Amino acid sequence: MVRSLLLVHAHPDDESISTGATMAYYAAQGVRVTLVTCTLGEEGEILVPDLRLLAADEADQLGGYRISELAAACAALGVTDHRFLGGAGRYRDSGMMGTPANNHPRAFWQADLDTAAAYLVDIIRDVRPQVVITYDENGGYGHPDHIQAHRVTVRAVDQTRDIVTKLYAAAVPRSAFAEGIQALRAAGDTTSFAGVEDVDNVPFVRPDEVITTAIDARAFLDRKIAALRAHATQIAVDGPFFALSNNIGQRAFGVEYYILLRGTAYPAGDGRENDLFAGVDVVQAGDVGAAT
């Protein structure tokens, strides 16, 4: 059986931030890793002053530029199969919730779910992934494109139960987020998540007990950081994060976490799965249902 992993992300850089180490980890094992990106990230904030004219409120050319950044990130992660949902530019970055960009006629937030899911079904039937990763129903932190990616992916997976065995949402457990803040502060970063006093009030943080799966990809943290560096318009490459090399930093950013949404969990000794493909060879086609 050829193992195949499909990830559905909203914008360029999302793949590297939340699942980059996982992608590199499985690609290095010879797993077929396919990344589907739903938009070009046209509404992203540009951190490079010389490229400010590419912004949505200027020349509106950021999306095209980010295609090259995404290609470099995929190369850093060892991923060779990348696709845009419906083709590059079919769906536009919707911007943050409640902004005018939500109403753009091509905004992903406005996409017809059946049409968008059909594009993804075609990809699933092509690459035949046993495992699919996207976001939870809140899109992690409530971004409309993340929410829409969840909806589209769930709809597509429910139509391809003969192929997909397990569906996961990328997640950040409370303990890992607290550890990450500690690592950033130790590295001299006093601005990231400034003012966060109660971790439980951070929108994308989930209780530890709902996390079903932890992928220890610390050996591939360097590839994740290289992929993040590739997204130079979006991520400050000179920040303390990129100097993280201590054990706390490796543990906080090199272990990635997931919640099983469809399929059956096969936990290891610590009560969590340590392999996304655990159990896929014992599940019969058509058995995919709500997570158990």
From Swiss-Prot:
- Of which family is this protein a member? Belongs to the MshB deacetylase family.
The signal peptide, as residue positions, is none
Highest taxon listed in the record's lineage: Bacteria
Q: Which Pfam families match?
A: PIG-L
- Note the HAMAP family from the entry: MshB
> What is the protein name stated in its UniProt record?
1D-myo-inositol 2-acetamido-2-deoxy-alpha-D-glucopyranoside deacetylase
Q: Which residues bind Zn(2+)?
A: H11, D14, H146
Q: Which GO terms describe its molecular function?
A: N-acetylglucosaminylinositol deacetylase activity; zinc ion binding
- InterPro entries associated with the record: GlcNAc_PI_deacetylase-related, LmbE-like_dom_sf, Mycothiol_biosynthesis_MshB
Which PANTHER family does this one have?
A: 1D-MYO-INOSITOL 2-ACETAMIDO-2-DEOXY-ALPHA-D-GLUCOPYRANOSIDE DEACETYLASE, N-ACETYLGLUCOSAMINYL-PHOSPHATIDYLINOSITOL DE-N-ACETYLASE-RELATED
Substrates-to-products reaction catalysed:
1D-myo-inositol 2-acetamido-2-deoxy-alpha-D-glucopyranoside + H2O = 1D-myo-inositol 2-amino-2-deoxy-alpha-D-glucopyranoside + acetate
Q: Which UniProt keywords apply?
A: Hydrolase, Metal-binding, Zinc
User: Which cofactors does it use?
Assistant: Zn(2+)
Q: What Enzyme Commission number(s) appear in the record? A: 3.5.1.103
Q: What does this protein's UniProt record list under function? A: Catalyzes the deacetylation of 1D-myo-inositol 2-acetamido-2-deoxy-alpha-D-glucopyranoside (GlcNAc-Ins) in the mycothiol biosynthesis pathway.
State the free-text cofactor note. Binds 1 zinc ion per subunit.
Transport as a keyword? no
GO BP terms in the entry: mycothiol biosynthetic process
